[in-house]
Structure formats: C-alpha cells, structure tokens
Amino acid sequence: MDLVNHLTDRLLFAIPKKGRLYSKSVSILNGADITFHRSQRLDIALSTSLPVALVFLPAADIPTFVGEGKCDLGITGVDQVRESNVDVDLAIDLQFGNCKLQVQVPVNGEYKKPEQLIGKTIVTSFVKLAEKYFADLEGTTVEKMTTRIKFVSGSVEASCALGIGDAIVDLVESGETMRAAGLVDIATVLSTSAYLIESKNPKSDKSLIATIKSRIEGVMTAQRFVSCIYNAPEDKLPELLKVTPGRRAPTISKIDDEGWVAVSSMIERKTKGVVLDELKRLGASDIMVFEISNCRV
C-alpha cells in the first residue's frame, strides 16, 4: 500500500477486491464512466477519466478504511459497516447484494426458536453483530451474556455438522447453501445490501465527491426507470397522466394531429408491463419504451 502515499492528488475509492460485490461494483463504476485498467498484480488502479485511485480491498476492511479517512468513498455491505462499528455516511443504496444475516440451526435439530440458543455456542464471522443480538436476547450486556460466540472466517455453514457450534449466524442470499448444509433459519439479525459509503472527514475536493455521487445516482436511476413515450387523445390526458406521472412531471408536446399530444415520461422498469397495458386500455397509441443508459437527477 506504499503507492497510496504517493496519490495525494487523487481521491481514494475503496472497492471490494473479489466476491459477491466485486463484479457489480465494477459495473456501476463503468456506468458512471469511472474507467480504469487493473493490473492483476496490484490492488490499486488509476482512473483514466477522473482524478480517482481505486483501492481494491476485502469488503470487510472497507468500512475501516473509509471510517478512518484513509479512503473518501467505498462500496461495501451494510453488514460490514455494522460489524465494523465505524461512523460513515451511507450515501447511496446500490440495490444489489441483498441478503439477510440470519440465525441458522440444523433442520432436524432440537432448536426452533433463538431463545433456545441462550447459553449455547454460536459460530459466525460477524462476531460483534452476533454478540449484540444474543446479548439483547438475554437482556444483558455482551460482557455478562452466557451465550458463547465463536469466530471462523469461512465455511461457517459447516460448523454445526462438524460439532463446532450449536448454531450459526451467517449471510443468506438465495438459501441454497443453507439448505444444502441441512440448516434452516429461525431469526434475522440484519437485512443488508451494498451501499456507497462516504467518509465523515473526506480529504479530497468536495466537488469531485459530489460529481462521483451524482454519476452513481444517475446509474441507479437508469437501472430503475425506463422512458415511456406515447400519443394521447387530449380528452383522455388527465386519466393517462395518472398512470404516467413521471418522476417530477411528464413532458407533453403538441403534434400535427388535431386533438392529440405526445407524452414522454419516466416509469419504473418493474411496472412497465402493467403501465403499457393500462395506457392502451385508456386510449393511448404508438406506445414505446426505451432504455435509459444514464442520466442525472
């Protein structure tokens, strides 16, 4: 990391170096036109489009680097932020990496409720979150609780089968790994997703930070919305605009056809099928949907 000390003219942006968050983080950077080339031998890459240096770190370490002001921005999961117990701004929900940190027990075992695990051994890589959860469950402090929390760095789901613990606290996304290990969830400690996090005391120019955040917000908006354009009879316009109110307001333009107007509006991607059906039912015609590659909101 000695190279970092020579990058005082660049904003340091911490990115997960591998795992479930890496590829989607890179996709968001590409969408925000933060271009870079990463050498396989280095965990630092210089952006060719902005004065930014990307620092590739384990997702669990990113909250600490951002919280201590070593990096101005980072991408990581809320679970890692809470586990690190650092003070950072959760700037933008990036809408990926959605999963739950859950208490899991053997499916055919004796434990059905988390209260039954008081005084037992819990295996996890999220020690602080597990300690807080079970201390609260016992109604006491971490120092005084009877439940034992044991740390392992990986393959947490194998712990019960190997006799290391009575239960585990681990992340669940689809649940396939949990079921394959013969486990079932009985409680949720935390729901999490990936966020852009920001240092409380950034060292870089605030306008550059604002530019990066604006670009990423644009990417997120483009992923969430599509552009809907259609022709509408003027006498049906009030009803049609209830279906497509837009983010702020729709754009309405006169066309060379008496009694008709053209309407352009942003609609949520997940509702486009229902919206198009309703527009057609209400009398709209020439209804089209276009992808939004990027935007500023």
From Swiss-Prot:
Pathway the protein contributes to: Amino-acid biosynthesis; L-histidine biosynthesis; L-histidine from 5-phospho-alpha-D-ribose 1-diphosphate: step 1/9
EC number from the UniProt entry: 2.4.2.17
Keyword Nucleus listed: no
Compartments reported by the entry: Cytoplasm
Classification via Pfam families: HisG, HisG_C
Principal cellular location given in the protein's record: cytoplasm
InterPro entries: ATP-PRT_HisG_long (IPR020621), ATP_PRibTrfase_cat (IPR013820), ATP_PRibTrfase_CS (IPR018198), ATP_PRibTrfase_HisG (IPR001348), HisG_C (IPR013115), N-reg_PII-like_a/b (IPR011322), N-reg_PII/ATP_PRibTrfase_C (IPR015867)
Catalysed reaction, written as an equation: 1-(5-phospho-beta-D-ribosyl)-ATP + diphosphate = 5-phospho-alpha-D-ribose 1-diphosphate + ATP
GO cellular component annotations of the record: cytoplasm
N-acetylmethionine PTM sites in chain numbering: 1
Keywords per UniProt: Acetylation, Amino-acid biosynthesis, ATP-binding, Cytoplasm, Glycosyltransferase, Histidine biosynthesis, Nucleotide-binding, Transferase
Segments crossing the lipid bilayer: none
Keyword Ubl conjugation: no
PANTHER family recorded: ATP PHOSPHORIBOSYLTRANSFERASE, ATP PHOSPHORIBOSYLTRANSFERASE ATP-PRTASE
NCBIfam families reported in the protein's UniProt record: hisG (TIGR00070), HisG_C-term (TIGR03455)
Family: Belongs to the ATP phosphoribosyltransferase family.
Record function comment: Catalyzes the condensation of ATP and 5-phosphoribose 1-diphosphate to form N'-(5'-phosphoribosyl)-ATP (PR-ATP). Has a crucial role in the pathway because the rate of histidine biosynthesis seems to be controlled primarily by regulation of the enzymatic activity.
Name listed for the protein in its UniProt record: ATP phosphoribosyltransferase
Species of origin: Saccharomyces cerevisiae (strain ATCC 204508 / S288c) (Baker's yeast)
